[in-house]
């Protein structure tokens, strides 16, 4: 019996979790064999683990060791630098595989939709994070970090990452895998204050406690919260929201009780505040902030309502971190409102053999580990459908050398195709470059350099 040929488009956590689930199912199920091909638009795998997780969070990045173990399986192949929708089309993949899983994530950002948002100095967190993580698509972002104050819009972990990177001592960052160009820009330490702005209150903030607590470890940085921001919030209020919220409020109160120290840089939290307008002649110079109040919608949820109160704050950099958003893949359905591919249980609506996992399936929610169960759920649906196809004599017929034919086809469509062997060359090069400096790796930040090293 031939193996089932499965393609996975994307190579982030949800993609690798799906691959691991497929291979495990083959190991534990009689008469079930799998051959998994992973297609990635970049020459490098791991998705946001490589290009999204902050460089000063190496423990989170260590999950890549699990991915490496999956990639070592002889039933697994990696093909990088191939763009689905450009080099190959979804319909062509569906013809050549028994099933195709799309794990393409949420590659865009949500806009603020306010005047001045397009001024130089106003950028999306997805761009800024990609820039300091050496994602080749964001090499040219080059934000101006010479100003004294930055404003980060958003109350999630990504907003904390951005603020922390802006204020962390560059000598500390120099021991991480941060992009060299980002380290060079951060070295002058021009930014003295980062203001984190959230439209709702502390009870509604989406930070995780670990991320919030570690801010206390920033050398030479004060975390500043006006005690009035926490007035009226009881332990019972926080506990009613959840355990994480209760812990967060405790941490925030600790920061609010501290006295700022002279000469320290500042990370300032502002709640119940929304951006109204970004001002400047040729670049960001000021931001207009509006004060909000919380109102109930009658169903137990609260929303931020503008009070009409305004404040103008000098700022030279504005980073919007109000959420990621999926983008359409040519040839696949797309729900523009949610930024996801419509599906039922992971199976794409109207398709017999196409599936989704991760953020493109459910939206940009949860942490890396959330994708594990999400991927397993989709794989369970996929395997069940494969069994139904087999029983109904709908199983595809492929020649014995089908895997070789697919590899040749991909190489013909993309002559600069990156294989697992090529990626291993890139990986070894980056690690070797970092070793003399006590860094885990020095990332290659341009597509041209990645291909030059990988392909030789």
From Swiss-Prot:
EC code: 1.18.1.2
Taxon lineage: Bacteria, Bacillati, Actinomycetota, Actinomycetes, Mycobacteriales
Short name of any one Pfam family annotated for the protein: Pyr_redox_2
Family under the similarity heading: Belongs to the ferredoxin--NADP reductase type 1 family.
Organism: Mycobacterium tuberculosis (strain ATCC 25618 / H37Rv)
SUPFAM superfamilies: Nucleotide-binding domain
Binding residues annotated for FAD, in chain numbering: 14, 40, 48, 84, 359, 366-368
Name under which the protein is recorded: NADPH-ferredoxin reductase FprA
Residues the entry annotates as binding NADP(+): 110, 155-158, 199-200, 211, 366
Function: Transports electrons between ferredoxin and NADPH. May supply electrons to P450 systems. The enzyme can use both NADPH and NADH as a reductant, but the catalytic efficiency is two orders of magnitude higher with NADPH.
Keyword Flavoprotein part of the UniProt annotation: yes
Gene transcribed to yield this protein: fprA
Gene Ontology cellular component annotations, sorted alphabetically: peptidoglycan-based cell wall
InterPro entries referenced in this protein's UniProt entry, alphabetically: FAD/NAD-bd_sf, FAD/NAD-binding_dom, Ferredox_Rdtase, Ferredox_Rdtase_adrenod
